[in-house]
Every structure is written in C-alpha cells, then in structure tokens.
Amino acid sequence: MKLIALCCLLLLGLLGFLAAPGVASPSRHTGPGNGSGSGAGSGNPFRSPSSQQRPLYYDAPIGKPSKTMYA
C-alpha cells in the first residue's frame, strides 16, 4: 500500500516539475514585438533582425505525371 502511494506521489511530482517551467516561460506569440513578425524582439531567438524568409525547396523536382497505362 505504501509502495503504491509512493509511486503516485513520485509520478505527480514529476508531472508538476515538468509542467511548471512551461507555465513560467513567456509565450512566443506575446511580447514586445507581437505585431512586427520579425526581428530580435518578436520572441524568436533564432531569427536575426536582417534575415528574410527563404523560399521553400522540395527534396525532388515535381515533373509531369508519367503516361503509364494501367489495365
């Protein structure tokens, strides 16, 4: 009985510890640069102020469909 209670307390403690930093961390969508969308103040630490978004490149070029005839 004590072992089950100890396991439950340990599990609740781990869940509380893992959930607590997420509550304290600031949201990406709120902050000083909410309307700008880019720059160092927008909450994105990986985007530099002078960088522009690059176009999306696919892994393989998309060509015309083959003319395979299925019976």
From Swiss-Prot:
Region (Disordered): 26-71
Induction remarks: By bacterial infection. Detected within 24 hours of infection.
Domain of life: Eukaryota
GO-annotated cellular components: extracellular region
Residues spanning the membrane: none
Ranges annotated as biased composition (Gly residues): 32-42
Main location as per UniProt: secreted
Coiled-coil intervals, chain numbering: none
Organ and tissue specificity: Hemolymph (at protein level).
Propeptide, chain numbering: 25-26
Keyword Signal included in the entry's annotation: yes
Keyword Signal: yes
BP terms from Gene Ontology: defense response; defense response to other organism; innate immune response; response to bacterium
Location(s) in or outside the cell: Secreted
Keywords noted in UniProt: Immunity, Innate immunity, Secreted, Signal
Residues in the signal sequence: 1-24
More info: Not induced after bacterial challenge in strains carrying a loss-of-function mutation for Toll. Constitutively expressed in Toll gain-of-function mutants.
Protein name as it appears in the record: Immune-induced peptide 18
Organism: Drosophila melanogaster (Fruit fly)
